[in-house]
């Protein structure tokens, strides 16, 4: 009886491990994944260009193979904003495996984010930055993938773990709390321009926040308003609504890695999730232009196209506050 019990325990552990650690294994940095996209439409590039130009988040269908495993009726669109161009041959991709077929996934992963390594001849910025960030706060796993499109090698991409419900479960132990992607619909590059920075309250009506925050949970607008209101009216109570330690780590990491395409630049490219302690946690995102690749530091023309590494290293840590907040 004892040996039979031990046998079943080992079976259970084996099955559990394959689920719990599948995402980490898929993103191991010593592995280069092979991903093949076979679009249903011959003019797939024109269709994706059109969706991007029109500002639509629609997807077109394709079959996708990942390390030899094939998935059908997958939804594909471009990923990102500044890294996409209709003039580019190599654009970034957002691949949704369960777009049509419910629960379709690869080793527990239902969405792939492939970055085109724009402005990074070293191919190291994004993967290295996430590796550093994960030592101090929850952040995506990332490695590399060779991408083939309709049988043609399209190039080497960075393969970045999506910040989604699976990510939330793994890092926070829950997935249903208020969850926001903090990216404005229309980026405002002017000094003092409104973006997804928490110094700006848009009132108690959720409609005022829609242009700046994309809600990815079933509820949470009132929680976001409470966070912003507390930060701006009763800052002494900040620790009741915000994980201050992780917030400081995010700012420190952005400054140390000279990553200005983030909160400290335009006030964008981060997530907020309300944990079980009722504190919002920032989640760093979009590190493809770290180590000085992004030149517009504070939504002004202060250093646009001209600042050097020395200037970046000695930048005032309050530059974002002085120009934006």
Language model: regions and residue ranges:
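N-terminal secretory signal peptides that target proteins for export/translocation
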Residues: 1-3
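Sec-dependent N-terminal signal peptides
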Residues: 5-18
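Phosphate/dinucleotide-binding and metal-coordinating scaffold of catalytic cores
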Residues: 22-325
């Amino acid at each position: 009886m004892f040996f039979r019990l031990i046998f079943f325990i080992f079976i259970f552990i084996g099955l559990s491990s394959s689920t719990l650690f599948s995402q980490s294994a898929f993103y191991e940095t010593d592995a280069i994944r092979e991903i093949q996209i076979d679009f249903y439409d011959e003019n797939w590039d024109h269709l994706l260009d059109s969706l991007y130009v029109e500002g639509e988040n629609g997807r077109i269908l394709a079959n996708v193979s990942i390390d030899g495993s094939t998935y059908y009726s997958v939804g594909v669109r471009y990923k990102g904003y500044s890294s996409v161009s209709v003039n580019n041959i190599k654009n970034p991709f957002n691949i949704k495996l369960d777009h049509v077929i419910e629960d379709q996934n690869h080793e527990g992963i239902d969405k792939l984010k492939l970055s085109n390594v724009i402005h990074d001849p070293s191919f190291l910025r994004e993967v290295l930055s996430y590796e550093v960030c994960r030592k101090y706060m929850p952040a995506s796993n990332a490695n590399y993938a060779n991408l083939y499109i309709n049988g043609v090698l399209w190039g080497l991409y960075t393969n970045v773990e999506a910040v989604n419900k699976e990510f939330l479960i793994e890092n926070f132990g829950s997935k249903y709390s208020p969850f926001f992607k903090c990216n404005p619909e229309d980026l405002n590059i002017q000094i003092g321009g409104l973006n997804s920075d928490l110094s700006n309250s848009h009132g108690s009506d959720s409609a005022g926040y829609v242009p700046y925050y994309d809600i990815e949970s079933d509820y949470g607008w009132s929680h976001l308003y409470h966070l912003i209101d507390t930060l701006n009216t009763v800052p002494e109570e900040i620790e009741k609504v915000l994980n201050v330690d992780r917030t400081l780590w995010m700012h420190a990491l952005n400054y140390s890695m000279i990553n200005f395409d983030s909160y400290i630049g335009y006030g964008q490219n981060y997530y907020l999730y309300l944990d079980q302690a009722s504190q919002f946690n920032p989640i760093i995102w979009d590190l493809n232009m770290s180590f000085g690749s992004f030149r517009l530091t504070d939504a002004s023309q202060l250093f646009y196209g001209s600042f050097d590494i020395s200037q970046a290293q000695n930048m005032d840590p309050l530059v974002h506050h002085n120009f934006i907040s």
